[in-house]
Structures are given as structure tokens and as C-alpha cells.
Curated annotation (Swiss-Prot):
GO terms for molecular function: structural molecule activity. It is found in: Virion. Signal peptide: none annotated. The keyword S-adenosyl-L-methionine does not apply. This is Major capsid protein. Keywords: Capsid protein, Virion. The gene is MCP. Major protein of the capsid. Belongs to the NCLDV major capsid protein family. GO terms for cellular component: viral capsid.
Amino acid sequence: MGGGLMQLVAYGAQDIYLSGNPQITFFKVVYRRHTNFSMESIEQTFNGFPNFGKKVTCPISRNGDLIHRIYLQATVTDSIASPGLTKWAGHKLIKSVEVEIGGQRIDKHYADWLHIWNELTQTAGHWDGYKLMVNGTTASQTVAPGATTVSKTMFIPLQFWFCRNPGLALPLIALQYHEVKINLEFGDSADVMGASGASLDSAALYVDYIYLDTDERRRFAQVSHEYLIEQLQFTGDESASSKIKLNFNHPVKELIWVEKASGDGVGEYDTTYDSAKLQLNGHERFTQRTPQYFQLVQPYQHHERVPTTCVLTVDASSIETDEAVMETCTTGGINVYSFALKPEEHQPSGTCNMSRIDNATLNLQGVDTDNTVKVFAVNYNVLRVMSGMGGLAYSN
């Protein structure tokens, strides 16, 4: 008897729990047929001239039935000499961006949030490519001999709920009476280009439209919809203190905070506090923990990536030994506390309803009071679309 057959007949009572009354096979593929659809990325133009420090609005045209991903494409002329395009310039370019339906703001994101979300969720396979998309590196580029400038184009993906999940694509076909707008405030030239007085060569939004087949299109237009969406809450820069009041609402899946010294830009985060704890109505949510718990353990448990910065250094004195190249890693300064098992997924896996908490405070012991602290909360809400209009089921 061959070894494979011997394994096959070595079947006992315990195997009943694994392969008794089987429900699937690994040796016959099963697939499901999907509805007919197509996608197309179409450029949208701003009302107003897009430039550093400006606020512009982009009405989303009704080219298709649903909208999914949105990218900001921006081109700048970068100086080869210093100062030049700064690191993470793509994130810094978007000071804030919000989506508006029928005049109601549904969600708003910020430059720091775009950076934080990338640091926590970007996969290893996409990391280097994403850095090129948003200029997440200070590496020099190959230019023509004698040239003093080089044109650079950045592609910055927006991270609204409908951009990250095709099942939450925004149904324009069901919003006949409400206009969808993207309101964008550009960052300062000094933050993005390293010098004031520069200007954008061009900027536009590219929206991925989804076209549905006749039957599904009719169904989307006629019936009402309820979407469980994610929103970002941010109460503004707080002066660093031992007690920071958290004025948040709705079921929150995670809290994220960063500490910034004066003059720090996007992606430049400080850590001066010795320990932190969260209090809800005067009760400790967890015992006091050190920064390493929030910057390493929590991201490791709940996110795709643990934000760290690693630098390779060469020790010239031991160049012929294995210790010649040393890697030094530090935490990224991004603090996380998750109420959910898997906060990156749309499927709810744990929340804390902050609407039912009268007094929530984040206690930071030993924090430098000259710094500022930004605290973000990711919450669930319900977007209702009916009778050609859309709005939130629960307001603040």
C-alpha cells in the first residue's frame, strides 16, 4: 500500500469533526455569476481655479450610475535644487476634503488622516508604489542634462466609505434630486513645495463610474437604500494636556491620536507622554499603558501594518564583518486604541457608542504641554437614500 493510501484509510473518530458529512471540496472550483456592469474613470473639473491655499468645489457629474474610487491628480513643477517637493507632498496637498450630498456634509478627511490611514492599512506589496504616487520619498529623479526643474504628477486616492468598498458605491442613479459635491481645500505652497509662492500646474479629480445593466439600473433607481457607512470625527487640534476631552458621537470602532511639536508637518509625530488611559464617565476603560502599547501592540493586533521608520546605517570600522550594516527602527508616533476586532473591515466587529457616554477623556501623563494633540475617531452611521434624496439617519 502506498503512503498516500495509508493516510486515506487511517480514518478515526476524531476525523468526523473535520471531514464527516463534508460540505465543500477543494478539487472542484465553484463560482457565482455576477450582474453585468462596466467601469470607467472620468475626469471632473473644479469650480474655481485649483491652487495652493485655495478652496474649490467639484460637482460630480452624472456620467454613470454609481461612483466608486476617486483620485486627485495634481502636477507641479519641482525644483531640482533645494527646496523642492517635500516628502509625502501628496498628503500635504490636501489640507481637507469633504463629500457633500444635497448640501449636507457627510464625511470630511484631513492631510494627517490620509497619512495615518496609509501608515496603518497599506499592504507591503503596495507600499513602494504608493510612495511614488504621493511623493512619499525624498529620492532624487533622473532629469535631462542642464535642466533645473522637473515636472511631477501625483495621484492621491481619497478614502471615503464608497471609495474603499464597491458594495458601498454611491448610487447617483438614486439621487435624482440631490447633487453630490467634493469640497477640497489645498495645502500651503510652503508645506508642499518647501517654498512659498509656487503654484500648481494642474489639478483634477478622476472618478471611477460604474454602469449597470438595464434591470439592475431600474432596481437601484426605484427602491430605497440604507448603507452602513464609516465616518471620521475630528474635533480639532487640542493643546496637549493631561486630560483631553473627547467630544465624539455614534458607535466608534477605534480612536487614533498623534502628538505634534510646533512646526511639525504631516507625517512628523512626536511622543512625549509617559503613559495613557481612557476614562468613560469617570471609569477606566483600561489600565494605564505606555506609548509602545498604543504604537506597536494595538496596530499589530488590529491593522495591516505597524507604523515604523527604519534606517540602515553602515559602520565603516567593521565594514568587513556581518555587523557592518545596522538597522535602526523607531515607532511612527501613531497611537491606536481599537474597540473592534478588525477595524479595517466594513463588517462591524465591536464598537463603543460614544453618543451614550456623557464624559470621555484621554489622559496623557507627562505630555509636553507645548505640543498639540490630534484625536480622530472612526464611527459608523447610516446613509439613507430614498425618493431621489440622500441623508444621514443620525446627526451629531
